[in-house]
Amino acid sequence: MADIIKQLEQEEIARLGKTIPSFAPGDTVVVGVNVVEGTRKRVQAYEGVVIAIRNRGLNSSFIVRKISSGEGVERTFQTYSPLIASIEVKRRGDVRRSKLYYLRERSGKSARIKEKLQLRAPKETSSAE
């Protein structure tokens, strides 16, 4: 029974055809959200740090936290929601936890996340001697 549900969810994800970049907790992302104001429809950018990811197939979601006017604001996004226009990873964060809820109590410099450095491929040494 569970396999049938899992298969249906995978088919639905494939049908949606959304390209979601790989991101992890600690990454700074910009989420483009479709907002309807009266008759106008526009895309609103929401930039912040991913503090949690919930992997549940079609019901997957993630929480983005940002500081707006000195106040912490968190927003939960459904990963496969039609309201999400785009997800762009701005910066990779180097963290050792999967849930960064401790950032809620932090402010200022202690709430910063170290940037993950990309490992470079080792240089090839030519043995021309």
UniProtKB/Swiss-Prot annotation:
Under PROSITE patterns, the record lists: RIBOSOMAL_L19
- Alphabetized GO MF terms: structural constituent of ribosome
Q: Which InterPro entries match?
A: Ribosomal_bL19, Ribosomal_bL19_CS, Ribosomal_bL19_sf, Translation_prot_SH3-like_sf
Please give the biological process terms from Gene Ontology that the record holds.
translation
Is the keyword Ribosomal protein in the record? Answer: yes
Sorted UniProt keywords: Ribonucleoprotein, Ribosomal protein
**What SUPFAM superfamilies does the entry give?**
Translation proteins SH3-like domain
One Pfam family from the record? Ribosomal_L19
**Protein name in UniProt:** Large ribosomal subunit protein bL19
Question: Is Flavoprotein one of the keywords UniProt gives this record?
Answer: no
Q: Give me the Gene Ontology terms describing cellular component.
A: cytosolic large ribosomal subunit
Described by its record, this protein's role is as follows:
This protein is located at the 30S-50S ribosomal subunit interface and may play a role in the structure and function of the aminoacyl-tRNA binding site.
Q: Which family does it belong to?
A: Belongs to the bacterial ribosomal protein bL19 family.
